[in-house]
Amino acid sequence: MSQSFRVLLVEDDDSLRCCLGEFLAAQGWEVGATAFATEALTMARQQRYDFSLLDFHLPGMTGLELFQQLVSLRPLPAILMSGLANAEEAAAAQHAGFFTFLRKPLDLARLRQSIQLLIQSHFGGPLIPLRLHQQHCLPPLPPKPPFPPTRPNR
């Protein structure tokens, strides 16, 4: 039986929040999900969470700002996700203390691996297998462009 965790999920895209919430709940974990940073802060004051998944671009504040306020309440390992972030924002996430930074569209295998490593790093014990119950809810990554055909040297 896997260990039970409480996860705070803050994602303003309704469909992605729903899919991620289903994936996390399929692990047997309790999920607190919201689209709003201010609501996430209220939830964190009322409930103790073990780790969080935060979107970078949220209404009212960034995921970085939210993370700083969350850890001022209590230490909380977090994964930051963004589809628009650049290298500077990824570096800022690392400097702020996020466990890792994931680019959207999310690769479910990478998300699973990141969560497994976060759990192992912060809570000890062996890597736990995560169920793939809802893997179909995340859109597939776009195909990589083919290499251009090589031309023979003339």
Would you name each region that the model predicts?
Residues 33-51:
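Acidic, metal-coordinating helix/loop segments flanking the phosphotransfer/catalytic sites
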